[in-house]
Amino acid sequence: MRLDEIKNLNFLVMGLGLNGGGVALSRFLLKHGAKLVITDLKSEAELALSIDSLRDFDDQIRYVLGKHDVNDFKKADIVVKNPSVRPNNKYLKLAKRVETDISLFLIFNKNPIIAVTGTKGKSTLVSLLYQALKKKYPRVKLGGNIGVSPLSFFDQLDGKSPLILELSSWQLQSLENFNPILSIITNVYNDHQNYYSNFDDYIIDKSKIFVNQTSGIVIIQDKAYYKYFSKFESKAKVILFSEFNPCNLDQDIFYSNKGEVYFNDNLIGSFFESQVVFMIPKLIAFFVAYYLNIDLNHMFQILKNFKGIEHRLEFVKLVRNVMFYNDTASTIPDSTVLSVKSLKTNDNCINLIVGGTDKNLDFSSFSKIINLVKAWILIKGSATVKIINVLEKSSIQYFVFDSLRGAVNYAFEISSPGDIVLFSPASASFELFNNEFDRGLQFKKLVDMLG
């Protein structure tokens, strides 16, 4: 399909949503003359912000909201689905052709792609890579799962500067011929088991970041590679990494040892990172800078000055000498465990706010941090029942609240000067919030109200 062919086709956007991806997709199609129908199970009132942002195209759009119409799926030349819609959806079975915003973008894109996936750490890593590359490549772009559809800046691409894409397993699922110049898998934990029938299917989708790569390198954590990805073939050169001394030196590998970074046996630089949760993204970013011949002194300054990104172990405020951290993006237990370990020192106590919607995950890893948490403050939800079971097995006291407001107020009430209140839910957000970002914003507003 060529760009000039869009105007001759009937498109159906399945899932306008509230996070901007559906709007960017719709704008791209409308700008290129598509005949467009937008359908979403949410109501017009729920989608008001997204609909308002498309008002200048009102005469070109037909909306079907609060339901789906089978005839729309039968008539459309191309259905562009939200990545979270499962491929076996009954409506998609009626479609002649199904794409996503990412797969559609890749049809037209000519820029070289650096692709990043992984269960956790993706957004932190792509943010670091973007900062590292923009000095050498002023027209570098960043998009994907970080909240910016690459279709939103398609017309600004020059065909040669690097494009950094953060990709979730759902986004990778539909990509059959994806061929980046450099691909990265930060880590793999159990996640989205409410979406996948088994963990192997999750791994298969993650592997699509590199299986069709024809050149360049793929960077994978050594333990994850040997456990999950060594069975997949690719023409890309595999380079492993380890945040500690490597478990195997038979393949090319970079790793950190007491702040020094080695590639195989060669020292390539050094940096220090005290927070466990930032160690892997910073280590990978440092090596990518080395691999792409980016000034390592420049890279060192970026790593030194990097304070994280919103919603990922984000320092919010100091209130009466109590520190508040927003870690709403921790939607699995392993991520919350890392966050607690990152903040815990001998001089502070952590009051942990946790709980939410279950994703069919195992919370037994919480046993690793039971003795690191001063108070367990739980928000009601389907996942919270599982957390309670883990705590009760260890005879740990906990407090359950019906609202985030109640949890925040109680955490502040019991905190002593020097304590940390960490909001790291280890769960999805859908029972009480629109999404995890809405949840994080509400947490920050509540903290602001404390003083």
Swiss-Prot record:
Gene Ontology terms: biological process: cell division; cell wall organization; peptidoglycan biosynthetic process; regulation of cell shape
Any one annotated GO CC term: cytoplasm
Catalysed reaction equations from the record: UDP-N-acetyl-alpha-D-muramoyl-L-alanine + D-glutamate + ATP = UDP-N-acetyl-alpha-D-muramoyl-L-alanyl-D-glutamate + ADP + phosphate + H(+)
SUPFAM superfamilies per the UniProt record, alphabetical: MurCD N-terminal domain, MurD-like peptide ligases, catalytic domain, MurD-like peptide ligases, peptide-binding domain
InterPro entries linked to this entry: Mur-like_cat_sf, Mur_ligase_C, Mur_ligase_C_dom_sf, Mur_ligase_cen, MurD
Subcellular location: Cytoplasm
Pathway(s) this gene product operates in, as recorded in its UniProt entry: Cell wall biogenesis; peptidoglycan biosynthesis
Broad class of the protein's primary localization: cytoplasm
Molecular function GO terms recorded: ATP binding; UDP-N-acetylmuramoylalanine-D-glutamate ligase activity
Assigned protein family: Belongs to the MurCDEF family.
Role played: Cell wall formation. Catalyzes the addition of glutamate to the nucleotide precursor UDP-N-acetylmuramoyl-L-alanine (UMA).
Name of the protein in its database record: UDP-N-acetylmuramoylalanine--D-glutamate ligase
